[in-house]
């Protein structure tokens, strides 16, 4: 399984003056790390281990003596099974259907061993062409076992997977997805294609070229087939088919370089229809969200295509799903959407996205808290009204500020981004709210950080806050935020930062010092804000409309 490196590279360097678009930070491949498909059942490649219950309408009669012969083989040690593979190959190439089927089952069982299945030894037997031949017979039980064996070979390493792909199995799998055969056979073919798609980008593109996506999409339909009565067994089989189809589609949508969007985006209407259905297995919702996260990872045109599908309200709702295998990819997808234009971000906000993302800040898993901060930082890089939504949520601001002093370093950095962005292009009310939540003290504490990114983010935030205070100064003669920073011993730290080796840091420090030197904060008491009995700063009545309590 591949994993995203946990680095902190950014597509866009921090800039002194951030507008609502440049402040948004697109995720690079190595940027923010949430482990995709961490559970064994959702690996990029999977092997069938547990025997499902295939249809009994195509029974193959195996005489007792043949059953006994193959049962004896099954009871052998692995070493003896490998030694006796030539005999199993002979049986597979027999003209006797009972021998062919029984040997096929034994090959499948060998390949389904949980640890270290003998994939290479089976490949060396040269049976893959025979498996492809059996895959095209008109007995679904034989097709099923053949597809299962090929699926497990394709679950191996790159060379083993390529052996299946190069043998000509792919067109047969795709043909069977569209054929009149059982759901079990289709499920196994979809599973095999998912293993191949998860191998390499070239393999993924090969499947897309052969029309795998177009063959898979119709199988996402969750209705009754041909008006037949739906039984519990039928429903369970349909769920199994859909689960594997969704997983395979998610593998077809993932990877860098990204697949042809015009091809993979065709699944969006079907995803929108399926994701709205209640009480499906968590794995289905999880893979649907992963597929969406891949589809909206990129230019705003891709984000808009996902939005236009109508899926966003349900996607945001899944942020409150109780299982992490769902809310993890849902957060990834929502996080990608809010990297878009302000109008695209607004769709998430309008569906209670800020509140639901805020709840995830309390999740124990570090990567979820980090991703949540990252998503909020892109929302606070938006319009003033969007910043107001974040800042006016007491839980959001309180938690973000708490993370500045009580979290791991990389989470602290993301929280810094979210809060610093909220000081830029924001309303007077939002700045006042942040100051009331003691953001100045936390920013000043971070001025001692050895992380250059944090230093620059914090200094930018302080500059934005002080610039807001200049509006007050025009009315009262005093910039209240300059005073507060000075009283918190922030001024001396900022002075020292003028000697910093980083050009960006000392330039920002110098800009801040200019505000201190131009402020007459050491004048008489009349030029200072009064302190009321609650220890709050008050300003003259002519500043009533913008008064603040700190």
From Swiss-Prot:
Alphabetical list of SUPFAM superfamilies matching this protein: ARM repeat
Gene3D superfamilies (UniProt xref): Importin-alpha, importin-beta-binding domain, Leucine-rich Repeat Variant
A GO biological-process term: NLS-bearing protein import into nucleus
Family: Belongs to the importin alpha family.
Quaternary organization: Forms a complex with tnpo/importin subunit beta.
InterPro entries cross-referenced by the UniProt entry: ARM-like (IPR011989), ARM-type_fold (IPR016024), Arm_3 (IPR032413), Armadillo (IPR000225), Importin-a_IBB (IPR002652), Importin-a_IBB_sf (IPR036975), Importin_alpha (IPR024931)
Localisation per UniProt entry: Cytoplasm; Nucleus envelope
The name this protein goes by in its record: Probable importin subunit alpha-A
UniProt KW Ribosomal protein keyword: no
Span list, region Disordered: 1-34
Membrane-spanning residues: none
MF (Gene Ontology): nuclear import signal receptor activity; nuclear localization sequence binding
One GO cellular component term: cytoplasm
Coiled coil: none
Keyword annotations: Cytoplasm, Nucleus, Protein transport, Repeat, Transport
Segments forming domain IBB: 1-56
Bias kind Basic and acidic residues: ranges: 1-30
ARM repeat extents: 116-155, 158-198, 201-241, 256-297, 300-339, 342-381, 385-424, 428-467
Domain notes: The N-terminal hydrophilic region contains the importin beta binding domain (IBB domain), which is sufficient for binding importin beta and essential for nuclear protein import.
Function according to Swiss-Prot or TrEMBL: Functions in nuclear protein import via a substrate-importin alpha-beta transport complex that passes though the nuclear pore complexes (NPC). Binds specifically and directly to substrates containing either a simple or bipartite NLS motif.
PROSITE patterns, alphabetized: ARM_REPEAT, IBB
């Amino acid at each position: 399984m591949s994993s995203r490196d946990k680095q902190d590279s950014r597509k866009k360097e921090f800039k002194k003056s951030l507008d609502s678009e440049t402040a948004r930070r697109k995720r690079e491949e190595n940027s923010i790390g949430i482990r995709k498909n961490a559970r064994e059942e959702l690996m990029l490649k999977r092997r069938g281990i547990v025997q499902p219950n295939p249809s009994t309408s195509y029974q193959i009669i195996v005489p007792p003596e043949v059953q006994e012969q193959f049962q004896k083989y099954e009871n052998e040690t692995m070493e003896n099974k490998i030694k006796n593979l030539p005999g199993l190959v002979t049986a597979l190439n027999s003209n006797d259907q009972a021998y062919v089927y029984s040997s096929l089952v034994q090959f499948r069982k060998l390949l389904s061993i949980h640890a270290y299945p003998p994939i290479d030894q089976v490949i060396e037997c040269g049976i893959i062409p025979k498996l492809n031949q059996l895959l095209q017979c008109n007995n679904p039980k034989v097709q099923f076992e053949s597809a299962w064996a090929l699926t497990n070979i394709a679950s191996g390493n790159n060379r083993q997977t390529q052996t299946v792909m190069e043998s000509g199995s792919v067109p047969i799998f795709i043909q069977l997805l569209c054929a009149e055969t059982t759901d079990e056979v289709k499920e196994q073919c979809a599973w095999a294609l998912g293993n191949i798609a998860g191998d390499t980008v070239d393999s993924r593109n090969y499947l897309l070229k052969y029309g795998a996506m177009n063959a898979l999409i119709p199988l996402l339909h969750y209705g009754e087939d041909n008006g037949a009565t739906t039984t519990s067994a039928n429903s369970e089989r349909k769920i199994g088919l859909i689960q594997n189809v969704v997983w395979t589609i998610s593998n077809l949508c993932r990877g860098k370089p990204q697949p042809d969007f015009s091809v993979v985006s065709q699944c969006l209407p079907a995803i929108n229809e399926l994701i709205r259905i209640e009480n499906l297995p968590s794995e289905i919702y999880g893979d649907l969200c992963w597929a969406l996260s891949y589809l909206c990872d990129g230019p705003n045109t891709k984000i808009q295509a996902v939005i236009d599908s109508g899926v966003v309200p349900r996607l945001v709702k899944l942020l409150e799903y109780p299982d992490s295998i769902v809310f993890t990819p849902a957060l990834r997808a929502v996080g990608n959407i809010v990297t878009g234009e302000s109008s695209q971000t607004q769709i998430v906000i309008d569906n209670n996205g800020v509140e639901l993302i805020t709840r995830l800040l309390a999740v124990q898993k570090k990567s979820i808290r980090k991703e949540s901060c990252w998503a909020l930082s892109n929302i606070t890089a938006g319009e003033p009204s969007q910043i107001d939504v974040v800042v006016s949520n007491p839980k959001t601001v309180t938690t973000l500020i708490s993370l500045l002093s009580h979290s791991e370093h990389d989470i602290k950095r993301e929280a810094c981004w979210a809060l610093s962005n909220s000081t830029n292009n924001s309303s007077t009310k939002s700045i006042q709210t942040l100051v009331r939540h003691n953001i100045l003290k936390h920013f000043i504490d971070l001025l001692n950080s050895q992380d250059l990114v944090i230093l620059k983010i914090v200094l930018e935030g302080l500059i934005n806050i002080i610039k807001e205070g200049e509006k007050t100064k025009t009315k009262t003669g005093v910039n209240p935020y300059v005073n507060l920073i000075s009283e918190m011993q922030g001024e001396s730290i900022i002075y020292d930062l003028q000697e910093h080796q980083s050009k960006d840091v000392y330039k920002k420090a110098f800009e801040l010092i200019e505000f201190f030197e131009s402020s007459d904060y050491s004048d008489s008491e009349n030029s200072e804000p009064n302190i009321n009995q609650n220890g709050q700063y008050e300003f003259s009545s002519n500043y009533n409309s913008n008064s603040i309590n700190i």
